[in-house]
């Protein structure tokens, strides 16, 4: 059980790594892909042994489990900023949105785990992680499309206003949800689950709608520019 939980504590980082990489996939050179893989792995290996030591010494707690997820997420977010350069606000937005998605997904996993029941804390963490991973796999296509639609279209154009308006929204929502429930909490009541789902869905819908509106505005501007150019070319 110790090895299984240690492995799951490491694998739980994979969803955020994948989702934050998706929007920038076409803009990462083969050299930088290798650098990302190196640093991701360099972070996962010591984390595995740290988790194994924590579990073997009987120090595994809900606080450590959650803090470990968050700390690795922050460190690898910094790695992304340093390697995939020129997209700082885009990375911060991706960090917040993916953290919110994973937090929401695993909150559902926690609630289901509570309903199933478990003996020791380690058993509950294993079950929660497995359920969370299963939900992530089920919804991965939708999560991926969300990241592609809210980030990717605005990387190659002058979208400074867009990122100035949106980059902090998912981070603020994620932190407000995290701090309101606390790192030490494991038990999830139905009311807590509903509040997390509503907070997460509201943030996702808001970011998606802002992206849609901004995309439409850019299309109108481009159309007006083409019409203006066409009009100028037809003048005697």
Whereabouts are the PLM-identified features?
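Juxtamembrane or sensor-core-proximal signal-transducing alpha helices
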Residues: 141-154, 177-190, 200-232
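Hydrophobic transmembrane alpha-helical segments in integral membrane proteins
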Residues: 1-14
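N-terminal, Lys/Arg-enriched amphipathic/low-complexity engagement segments
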Residues: 40-44, 48-50
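Interfacial loop-to-helix junctions that mark the boundaries of transmembrane helices
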Residues: 1, 122-127, 190-195
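Small-residue-rich transmembrane alpha-helices that serve as helix-helix interface/gating elements
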Residues: 130-134, 193-203
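Juxtamembrane segments at transmembrane-helix boundaries
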Residues: 15-37, 50-166, 171, 177-185
């Amino acid at each position: 059980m110790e090895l299984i939980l240690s492995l799951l504590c490491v694998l739980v980082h994979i969803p955020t790594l994948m989702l934050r990489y998706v929007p920038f996939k076409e803009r990462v050179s083969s050299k930088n892909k290798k650098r990302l893989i190196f640093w991701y792995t360099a972070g996962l290996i010591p984390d595995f042994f740290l988790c194994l030591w924590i579990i073997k010494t009987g120090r595994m707690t809900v606080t450590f489990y959650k803090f470990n997820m968050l700390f690795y997420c922050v460190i690898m977010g910094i790695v992304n900023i340093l390697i995939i350069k020129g997209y700082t606000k885009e990375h911060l937005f991706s960090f917040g949105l993916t953290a919110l998605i994973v937090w929401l997904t695993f909150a559902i996993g926690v609630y289901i785990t509570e309903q199933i029941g478990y003996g020791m804390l380690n058993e509950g963490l294993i079950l929660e992680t497995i359920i969370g991973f299963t939900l992530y796999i089920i919804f991965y296509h939708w999560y991926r499309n969300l990241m592609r639609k809210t980030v990717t279209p605005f990387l190659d154009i002058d979208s400074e206003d867009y990122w100035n308006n949106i980059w902090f929204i998912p981070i603020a929502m994620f932190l407000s949800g995290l701090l309101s429930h606390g790192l030490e909490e494991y038990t999830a009541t139905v009311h807590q689950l509903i509040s997390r789902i509503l907070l997460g869905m509201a943030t996702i819908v808001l970011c998606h709608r802002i992206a849609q509106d901004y995309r439409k505005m850019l299309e109108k501007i481009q159309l007006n520019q083409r019409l203006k150019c066409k009009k100028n070319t037809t003048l005697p």
